[in-house]
Amino acid sequence: QKTSLILALALAFTPAVWAENVNINGTGVSIEANKTPINTAKNSDAVAQLPKDYRFAVPGKFTVAVAGLNQPPLTVFSDDNKTLLGSEVDVARLVADSLGLELNVVPTSWEDWPLGVASGKYDAAISNITVTKARKEKFDFATYRKDSLGFYVKSTSPIKSLQKAEDIAGLRIIVGSGTNQEAILLAWNAENL
């Protein structure tokens, strides 16, 4: 609960400053590590909303887990292979700035973020996390993106359209293990086989 409280409060009081060029892989977006990142000023109103007894994972820092590494435009390593860039890192930086904290981005595996946030290892996970009923029972969410799901097939595939759940029954589909997308597909498949 504390994670989304921090994120929601900070974003509510933070003016949005987003990069204008969003093209990827040599078509407009620089991944140079020395580029000046977007920033915002400390916001006293946001800081005042924090519970008095709140303790950050690392004092003076906003520690954020990111798991979707090298998934532009969300999170991608810069040309130095150390610095993380992308919209999720930008959101984390704006929250940290508005709270007057240094940003501490921690690359992690997808499987690690839930336990890491629950245990206090991370203050937040900003990593393309879909809001689900099960996750809402453990964590608070402050959504910063619309979750749109879709399917891709080879242009030579006999599959020309997937419109409803029964259309995927029996198909072999690649999806990230443990993701919301996997749960949806397994349920659809079970309902329609």
Predicted features along the sequence, with ranges:
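Flexible hinge/capping segments at coil-to-helix
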Residues: 154-173
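Sec/Tat signal peptide C-region and signal peptidase I cleavage site
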Residues: 15-19
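Residues embedded in well-ordered beta-strands
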Residues: 63, 150-152
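Secondary-structure junction motif
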Residues: 174-192
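Bacterial N-terminal signal peptides
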Residues: 6-14
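Extracytoplasmic small-molecule ligand-binding "clamshell" domains
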Residues: 32-128
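A ligand-binding cleft/hinge motif common to bilobed small-molecule-binding domains
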Residues: 111-115, 129-136, 184-188
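Ligand-binding "clamshell"
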Residues: 79, 133-147, 190-193
